[in-house]
């Protein structure tokens, strides 16, 4: 079988060969590389698309607690390019067929899955079975059931699991969390968040293919807006009502283009989100009893910007969000620091996404949510 890539993944699945052929490699059990005796953890990037190429790999040149140790790619031409650029030894380069052999490699402590959404669960589970800690890029999966499977696999293997929520580590977001946690502006009454961009590129890109992406704007950018309303209110929502809009059906053939949703929170606060692959949007706003605060931009790669009703400008030195994120996860593994973006957070957000889709399918009816408390400010439960 040819090496698996984003380009031939659909073909394999259509022939009924995808998961069966990929999983034909016998899983190997080995002792987990804990990294406890290392100064830095070795990270292997699984999938060398634009995010790995332009964000993660450069960030790993500046991280303090981890480094780029290996790669997994289905494109042979990329192997030499990456090996030469980042001095990656041949023994640390894998494809999707021999991926399970990574279990034997003590150079690699963490596997970062950066594949199309529908492939997250499979490779996170395989990484856990190989005894490697796991970072799963957002969204965690394409269903709540897949989230559960990933969490269970990591728990059984005794490995750590984190979700690639870069904003949870960056200072502007953490300042918003502080405002809410310390009641700087009193009780939160309203929060809104927008996250989107205009997609006008290749109509065959995997994000526009539901078989690969699992959804459209909601699973891609919408998770940022959902997270903003949660840490902006300090609570998980108790209900959601949602609507979908399509103005370019010829382009967005089987994925959602634009979605709006309204949340209710336990303390009486309300929230609104808008997410789109057709509208440029990048902000969050919180109104409280004695004032307001906002970030705009709020969810791009930075630098971000913010201000408050007191006239204060929210400003921090710019650092790579990906660098901060991967260092935070590495500190969790190495020093048992809090896991600020655990698998449970990824699952929570997938439950909310599923409820949004359910509301849309029911013509905008309210859908009640029964979420476990916590994960409102980060990995440390709030209640």
How should these model regions be labeled?
Residues 1-20:
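N-terminal secretory signal peptides and thylakoid transit peptides that target proteins
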Residues 91-153, 381:
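Beta-loop-alpha module in the N-terminal Rossmann-like domain of NAD(P)-dependent dehydrogenases
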Residues 65-86:
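NAD(P)-binding Rossmann-fold cofactor-contacting core
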Residues 149-166, 189:
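Rossmann-fold dehydrogenase core element
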Residues 16, 312-383:
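C-terminal helical cap and adjacent loop that interface with cofactors, partners, or active-site loops
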Residues 24-62:
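C-terminal segment of N-terminal export signals and the immediately downstream linker at the start
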Residues 250-256, 264-327, 342, 356, ...:
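NAD(P)-dinucleotide binding in Rossmann-like oxidoreductases
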Residues 167-252, 363:
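Predominantly a Rossmann-like dinucleotide-binding segment in NAD(P)-dependent oxidoreductases
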